[in-house]
Amino acid sequence: MMNEEFKKRFDQYKNGEMSDQEMTAFEEELEKLEVYQELIDSELEDDNDWDLSISPEKQKAILAYGKRKSYLRISVLAVISTLMILPLCTLGSYLYYGMGGKHSTGNEFMETAAVTVALTMPNVLVDTSGLKSQVKLFGMNTEFPLQKQIGTKTAAVGNERVEMFYNKVKAPAVNYYDLEVNKTGHYFTHPSNKSEQTTAKAEKTLSTLPEGTVSEVYLSYDRAYPTKDVYNKFKGYDVSFLWNAIETEKNTNKTASTEPLGYPGKDSKFLAALNTKGKSNGDQFINALKFMSKHEKWAQVISKRKDLNVDNRLDYVEKNGVNVYGSVVTGPTKEIQRMLKNKSVKSANVGEVELWNW
C-alpha cells in the first residue's frame, strides 16, 4: 500500500504535477531515503546476511532526484564559465585590435579606410576627427564621416560603416545625405576616349548659374600631364585644385570608362590629414599606393572595387611617373566657365553648387 502511494507521488513529481510546496516536501523525503540507503549499504558491508533493500520505485525516485541535482550543477557551472570566458574574450579582442600602437590592427584598418577613400572617391575624404570605432567580441565596428569641399566650405556628405570579424572586413554600409553625391557616373573622360570629349553641357549648366555661386567641376584634359604642368597651365585662374585623377594604366580604349584613381590636389584641406611623407604630391601618391597595397583586400571591400590591382598600378606609376588626366576644381562659377575655354580642357562635368563662400 505504501509502495503504491509512493509510486503515485513519484509519478506526480516526475510529471511536474505537484505544487511547489508538495515538491519540496517530497524532495526532503527523498533526501532521507538517500541517507537511509547509505546507512543500509554501510550495514550490509559489515553483515552480508542482511537482505534489506529499497523498493524499485524509491530507487527510481532517488535516481531522478540525483539527475535533477546534477542538471542544476551543470547549468550553474555553464553560466559561471560563460561569465568568466566572455570578458576574457572581449579583452582579447581589445588586445588584438589595440596592441602595437600606430601599427595595431585597428589603427592600420582606420588608416587604410582613410587612404582608400582619398584615392578612390574624387573630392570625398574621411573626417578623421569624427571617426568612431567600437571593439566587440571577436570584432570591431568602425564608422567614419565623409566630407567634401566646395568653394572654401567643407561639408558632410554622409558616413560609411564597416564591420570587421577578426581580420576580415564585411561590405560597408554607406549612407549619403544627398543621393546626388552617390551618382558616380563618369567623373572624368580618359584622353583615349575621343567620343566623349566635350564641354558643351557643362558650359550650358554653368551659364545658367548666377555670379554669386561657387561650383565643383570635374575637368578632363586632352592628355595626361605631370602634376606641376597642370598647375602651371591654370595658375592664372582663381580656382582651387581639390583632387587629381592619375593615369595608372596604359592609355587604351579599355581604360576610358574605368573608375578613376587619384589623390587630393594642392588646395585640398584634406591633404595634410593623410599624413603621408613625401617631397611632392607625386611622392605622396606613390607612398599612399604602397600603404594601400599592404591591405588590398580591405581596400577592395571599402571602395567596392575589384579592379584596384594596386601593385600593377604602383608599378606603372613608378615607371612612367605621376601624370594627371583630370582634376576636380572649385571656385567662382563664372571663373570656372572661363577656364573651360582653355584648349587643354577637353570635357567637363558639373558637380555640386553652393552659394558664395569664396
Swiss-Prot record:
Residues spanning the membrane: 74-96
Coiled coil: none
Name of the protein in its database record: Probable anti-sigma-M factor YhdL
Location relative to the cell: Membrane
Gene Ontology CC entries for this record: membrane
Organism of origin: Bacillus subtilis (strain 168)
Membrane topology category: Single-pass membrane protein
Taxonomic superkingdom: Bacteria
Induction: Cotranscribed with sigma-M and yhdK. YhdL and yhdK negatively regulate sigma-M.
Keywords: Membrane, Repressor, Transcription, Transcription regulation, Transmembrane, Transmembrane helix
Encoding gene (name): yhdL
Pfam families assigned: Sigma_reg_C, Sigma_reg_N
Keyword field contains Zinc: no
Chief location category: membrane
Subunit structure comment from the entry: The N-terminus of YhdL interacts with sigma-M. YhdL interacts specifically with YhdK.
InterPro entries: Sigma_reg_C_dom, Sigma_reg_N
